[in-house]
């Protein structure tokens, strides 16, 4: 096993198999594994060659790529190893230490082959993390999420390459992972007499909470090794549809809501991966008068992973255009929840009955009374009026059918069916039967994806990116921007109800982690959807900016940089901490500062603007942040080792490439090096004196002539035996000649 050629994930897998600590940077892991292999070798020799704990785990040597002689290959190698260190750092912060074993007992290797273990470790970088346990079942009207989350869902890794693009920026000085029991109490040390820098230790918080910025940084590191993003899938061509039909609107629906082909139903796209995620859609038409109804049926509860405590729920009702996608959690948004609750503007009250799989809910809107009345029915049974809406406050806004579901499949009847699930009350008509001129159509999506635009936010945590994005989207309603950010996804993952008990730290941390993972998938879906988007993330790394914007190849791509002055930024960070209850880890903040650079207009950035301070004012602040962070981040010893190894490799390449000049081999004495290396008086003796010192011993042992007569009789006897064998076994001789002499070799 060549330890130096193993990747971080492979090193971790081998260490875990032996019950050893798998935390640390690559150089530490390699040293730890090499010591374990040496110990096993000594045990084998002492015990007569018995197999040790790692005896059966001989990894196949990985092919060594030809090292380029130019600077580009060196930069890519640096970036690859630095990114492995970055991933190792992030994994260490989440990794639980292995269970302590009895003294003197060896760890039992798993039954699976080492190749499979290495592949599994490489495919799942977070495999060492332990899932959070759910603390309670699904009892109560608020479902199972209020007491705790289900099993942890690991993000499906994408195929990644081992190197980064030359144009991307990778952290220059990575902090070394500190080991030992005293890591929580030891603090940064000031520079001593030898001039060493003050270091900020990377360590796991005792609260096991990280916050949005940490997991956003983690996702960025997870995807940062792709040379270039996969090209977006070709969008299916829209067939000519009857624009007078009432069906689900794919332009305003959630990206993670999978609308059926006939657009009269749908289901969540990530129900198995993210079971806490709500998703839904509105209809293409709304109404402002008359007595109108529609039906919604829960056709199926989607299966969930074993141990998941989440429940399947449907919320159905009415909402106005431009309201939030979470039905019942915004003004002029009214929903009836499967837990027997009604919701309006985020306020929940008990109403009607609970409902679930195979139940049909009728939704009725009566505009002919003094106030607009919204009522519901279950399987044809009237449940009464749930909401009364003032016509003055509603004004001329139209009410649109709206569904929101979690882990279930919903089917809608707007009147397109020949027969309804249940007959509606007298004088009520399905919305599809309302004349087209009396309906209100929602916005029509762009005809081509070239008409769409994407805005990439760039800035440190707490700089005000989200506020800028929400304000800009509100000021430009005709664009209908979809703001994709961790906070947006978190709102769609939180369960609201009559009571909202606080989640335990582990469950809250897991929810934030899942939101970051879900956001990465939504960005990929957005790149092939005809809408306008604002990517509300930090995006301080050039590699992350490039990777995301290249996904939106046919969009109009803009970048907005938000850099406030230092005083405002500190105030916003404090306010962010008060509102969200978490702080940005210092090590993550330093990494972001050290690698924050202002983007420039290029082939994948059509426009770069500044949301607060202009570039001339922002540049000195960013430069100051970089310098301060790099002073606090400890230097990486690994970087120095790599540079020395690279110089050694370059010397070897030069000697191979310049070994022959003019058809004659150049000797050591002809090398273009200083005379001090070739044994001049007063110097170290050099290579030539060292070589001559042992030349005599070499010649005495290896320089002897071969004595043929001494071994002639020995070989002659074996030759007779083989001839006799082939004489009595001609079939073997023929097979031997065919296999050996029949092969013609390379031509």
UniProtKB/Swiss-Prot annotation:
Segments of this protein annotated with the region Disordered: 40-242, 627-666
Record InterPro entries: B30.2/SPRY, B30.2/SPRY_sf, ConA-like_dom_sf, P-loop_NTPase, SAP_dom, SAP_dom_sf, SPRY_dom, SPRY_hnRNP_U
SUPFAM superfamilies assigned to the protein according to its UniProt record, in alphabetical order: Concanavalin A-like lectins/glucanases, P-loop containing nucleoside triphosphate hydrolases, SAP domain
Chain intervals with Basic and acidic residues compositional bias: 148-163, 185-223, 627-639
GO BP annotations, alphabetical order: alternative mRNA splicing, via spliceosome
PROSITE patterns referenced in this protein's UniProt entry, alphabetically: B302_SPRY, SAP
Residue ranges with Low complexity bias: 115-125
Modified residues (Omega-N-methylarginine): 656, 684, 738, 747
PTM sites of type Phosphoserine: 161, 168, 185, 188, 226, 228
Subcellular location: Nucleus
Pfam families: AAA_33, SAP, SPRY
Keyword field contains Nucleus: yes
Biased composition (Acidic residues): 73-97, 232-242
Biased composition (Basic residues): 640-654
Leader peptide range in chain numbering: none
Positions with biased composition (Gly residues): 137-147
Subunit-structure text: Binds to MLF1 and retains it in the nucleus.
Protein name (Swiss-Prot/TrEMBL): Heterogeneous nuclear ribonucleoprotein U-like protein 2
Gene: HNRNPUL2
């Amino acid at each position: 096993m060549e330890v130096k050629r193993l990747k971080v994930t492979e090193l971790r897998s081998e260490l875990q198999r032996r019950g050893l600590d798998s935390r640390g940077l690559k150089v530490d892991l390699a040293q730890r594994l090499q010591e374990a292999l040496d110990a096993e070798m000594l045990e084998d020799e002492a015990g007569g060659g018995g197999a040790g704990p790692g005896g059966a785990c001989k990894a196949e040597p990985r092919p060594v790529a030809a090292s380029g002689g130019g600077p580009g290959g060196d930069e890519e190698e640096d970036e690859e190893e630095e990114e492995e260190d970055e991933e190792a750092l992030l994994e260490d912060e989440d990794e639980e230490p292995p269970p302590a074993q009895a003294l003197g007992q060896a760890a039992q290797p798993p039954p699976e082959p080492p190749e499979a273990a290495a592949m599994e470790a490489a495919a799942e970088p977070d495999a060492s993390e332990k899932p959070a346990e759910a603390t309670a079942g699904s009892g109560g009207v608020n479902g199972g999420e209020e007491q705790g989350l289900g099993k942890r869902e690991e993000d499906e890794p994408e195929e990644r390459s081992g190197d980064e693009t030359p144009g991307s920026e990778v952290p220059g000085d990575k902090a070394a992972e500190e080991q030992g029991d005293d890591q929580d109490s030891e603090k940064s040390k000031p520079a001593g007499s030898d001039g060493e820098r003050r270091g900020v230790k990377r360590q796991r918080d005792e609260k096991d909470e990280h916050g949005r910025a940490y997991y956003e940084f983690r996702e960025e590191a997870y995807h940062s090794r792709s040379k270039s993003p996969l090209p977006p899938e070709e969008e299916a061509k829209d067939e000519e549809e009857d624009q007078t039909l009432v069906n689900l609107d794919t332009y305003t629906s959630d990206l993670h809501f999978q609308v059926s082909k006939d657009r009269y139903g749908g289901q969540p796209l990530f129900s198995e991966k993210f079971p806490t995620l709500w998703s839904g859609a509105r209809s293409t038409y709304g109404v402002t008068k008359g007595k109108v109804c529609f039906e919604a049926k829960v056709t199926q509860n989607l299966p969930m992973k074993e141990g998941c405590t989440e429940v399947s729920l449907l919320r159905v009702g009415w909402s106005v255009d431009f309201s939030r996608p979470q039905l019942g959690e915004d003004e002029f948004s009214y929903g009836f929840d499967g837990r027997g609750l009604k919701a309006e503007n985020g306020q929940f009250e008990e109403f009607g009955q609970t409902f679930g799989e195979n139940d049909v809910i009728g939704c009725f809107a009566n505009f002919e009374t003094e106030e607009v009345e919204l009522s519901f029915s279950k399987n044809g049974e009237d449940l009464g009026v749930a909401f009364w809406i003032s016509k003055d406050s509603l004004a001329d806004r139209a009410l649109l059918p709206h569904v929101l579901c979690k882990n279930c499949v919903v089917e809608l009847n707007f009147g397109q069916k020949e027969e309804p699930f249940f007959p509606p009350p007298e004088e009520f008509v399905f919305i599809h039967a309302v004349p087209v001129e009396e309906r209100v159509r929602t916005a029509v999506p762009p005809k081509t994806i070239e008409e769409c635009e994407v805005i990439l936010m760039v800035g440190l945590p707490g700089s005000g990116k989200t506020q800028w994005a929400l304000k800009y989207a509100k000021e430009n309603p005709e664009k209908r921007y979809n703001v994709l950010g961790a906070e947006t996804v978190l709102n769609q993952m939180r369960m609201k109800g009559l009571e909202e008990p606080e989640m335990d730290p582990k469950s809250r941390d897991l929810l934030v982690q899942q939101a970051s993972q879900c956001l990465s998938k939504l960005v990929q879906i957005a790149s092939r959807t005809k809408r306008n988007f604002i990517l509300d993330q930090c995006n301080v790394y050039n590699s992350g900016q490039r990777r995301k914007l290249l996904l939106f190849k046919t969009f109009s791509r803009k970048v907005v940089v938000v850099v406030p002055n230092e005083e405002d930024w500190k105030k916003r960070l404090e306010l962010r901490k008060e509102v969200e209850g978490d702080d940005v880890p210092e090590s993550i903040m330093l990494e972001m500062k050290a690698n924050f650079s202002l983007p420039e207009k290029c082939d994948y950035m059509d426009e770069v603007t500044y949301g607060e301070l202009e570039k001339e004012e922002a540049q000195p602040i960013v430069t100051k942040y970089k310098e301060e962070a790099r002073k606090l981040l400890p230097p990486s010893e690994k970087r120095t080792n790599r540079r020395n190894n690279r110089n050694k490799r370059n010397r070897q390449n030069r000697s191979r490439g310049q070994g022959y000049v003019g058809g004659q081999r150049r000797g050591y004495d002809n090398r273009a090096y200083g005379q001090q290396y070739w044994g001049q008086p007063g110097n170290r003796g050099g290579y030539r004196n060292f070589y001559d010192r042992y030349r005599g011993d070499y010649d005495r042992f290896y320089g002897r002539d071969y004595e043929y007569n001494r071994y002639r009789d020995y070989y002659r006897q074996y030759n007779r035996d083989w001839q006799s064998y082939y004489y009595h076994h001609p079939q073997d001789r023929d097979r031997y000649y065919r296999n050996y002499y029949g092969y013609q070799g390379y031509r």
